[in-house]
Amino acid sequence: YKKKEFSPESTLILFEEPEAFLHPTQQEYLNSSLRALSAEDGQQVIISTHSPVFVSRNIEEISSVIKLKREKGVTKCFQVSEKARKNIIERNNEFVELLSSKLDDPFTNKKTKDRIRNILGDTEDGKRMEEEAIRYSLWLDLERASSFFAEIVLICEGATEKAFIDYLIRNEWIDLRERKIYVLDVMGKFNIHRYMNLFKELGIYHSILADRDENNNVHEIINQFIENNKNIYTKNIYFFDKKIEDFLGIPLPHRRDKRPLNVLWHYKNGKISKDKIYKLKRIIERLI
């Protein structure tokens, strides 16, 4: 009897939680090694992970990221297929199309049109679509990729809301920690719909917290667009009448980049009333 030689045409490597016992830099190195290995002929690598490092470093090939989610004893699978990825890009561009239509509308006032032109710039349609395709690879960095593992993501307009709410959850609102919330700064209201579209495909529940910016026609357009963009994974939306500083009853700093520091300074120095903090917590509880 002659033993047959085993010479498979392909090799499947299964790796459970490769991040175990590795600090982030080592995880980065291992991820690069696994990607290089999977690029070889006849090699396929499948990993299971709870590490944002492995998620963020594979966003450019987001179709290779599969999210498993258990609900009421049933495990569901979510994946952004290539078709879904293209649909996300097209849906993201709907806001540009909406603004462009307002430019052609004779009932849109000059001030609003000037603001829209400033937002749109002179980017050509083809290039704009290409830019949409790479936005997530730029934005879903190591920190933001943590949103993939949250029970619910609180999408905030800017860094001020994120910094303050994160601080309160870590230090004051102990009961909210158990809700496994991730507070996401999307770097401006004009990006909120992009994350809503992505989270829909990945089955990630989310709520939105933003400024209404009253008496601003362009913001009225985007506010309504966000409302209309709700999907089955969008829980709730709340708009402050103006800015969070107005809600908290504190002044705005002279520089925009000082806003997160400004809010935290006023809070730590007892300049924000307990009633305001209570009302803010009630808003967050309704959102999640």
Give, region by region, the residue ranges found by the protein language model.
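Acidic, Mg2+-coordinating catalytic modules of nucleic-acid enzymes
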Residues: 95-155, 159-288
